[in-house]
Amino acid sequence: PLGAPLAQVDAFVAGRARWIEAARVRALARGEEEQRPCSVSREDALALFTQVSDAVFPLFAQVLNGQRPVLKVRQMKTRWGVCVPAKRQITFSLRLAEKPRAAVEYVVLHEYAHFVRADHSPAFWAVVARYMPDYKARRRLLAPSVQGGMESPEGPPPTY
């Protein structure tokens, strides 16, 4: 608090030194991640997202009246994907292409599920779980420390 004795402030900081250092390390890692150039081109990323989308689309074709959404790729700092149902459009983060394929499959299916439910309600998560029961494990693959990389254009078959 303003006007607190310096000894009290020092004791407060000393008592939380481990947490402060851990937070500092996390903040530095985020900064390094944002400044590191992406190892995947936009074209290769779009090809990957299109390939996974082609496998997911049949699950949602009826909701979309058989019309595939427009897929886009852009540099995003805080999201892996964004779905705009009114525009029938999904935008993916370029950095998502650096993650393991199972994580990419999760994000693609997650964004498609927004065509059914445009929120993150229990009903939305039920849609995700219906088609991908292991979605929580896949979502953990999006952590900053997990790197995957691109696989061959054919890649393994979808795991859902």
Please name every model-derived segment.
Residues 1-106, 115-160:
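Active-site-proximal or metal-binding-adjacent scaffold patches in catalytic folds
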Residues 111:
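Walker B catalytic acidic pair
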